[in-house]
Curated annotation (Swiss-Prot):
<protein>
    <recommendedName>
        <fullName>Theromyzin</fullName>
    </recommendedName>
</protein>
<keyword id="KW-0732">Signal</keyword>
<comment type="function">
    <text>Has bacteriostatic activity against M.luteus. No activity toward E.coli and F.oxysporum.</text>
</comment>
<keyword id="KW-0964">Secreted</keyword>
<keyword id="KW-0929">Antimicrobial</keyword>
<dbReference type="GO" id="GO:0005576">
    <property type="term" value="C:extracellular region"/>
</dbReference>
<feature type="signal peptide">
    <location>
        <begin position="1"/>
        <end position="21"/>
    </location>
</feature>
Length: 107
């Protein structure tokens, strides 16, 4: 149960990113849809989130985030489906890069 709470908190950040991207780009600008979030912007937001995460919770949150990025963990039902849509736009290499980036917060 504790792991589900941590996963939900970590993925809340993912949902926030998705909502921000949708809010910025869902104004009839479909031609710019590919510009929703760059890897660098995602990394900046992940860093901000990780910096605010209590050290004793960081390991579990990083693992939950890696599992979700690498397709080993499902999106919790309370998160909007658009989170999956945003992740689906990333290549496997980009998802792996973000998953590896998450590990840097454990050192």
């Amino acid at each position: 149960m504790h792991a589900k709470i941590i996963l939900a908190l970590f993925l809340g950040m993912t949902a926030f990113l998705a909502v921000q991207a949708d809010h910025h780009h869902d104004h009839g600008h479909d031609d710019h849809e590919h510009e929703e979030l760059t890897l660098e912007k995602i990394k900046e937001k992940i860093k901000d989130y990780a910096d605010k995460t209590p050290v004793d919770q960081l390991t579990e949150r990083v693992q939950a985030g890696r599992d979700y990025l690498l397709g080993k963990g499902a999106r919790p039902s309370h998160l909007p489906a658009r989170v999956d849509r945003h992740l689906s736009k990333l290549t496997a290499a980009e998802k792996q890069e973000l998953a590896d980036y998450l590990l840097t917060f454990l050192h």
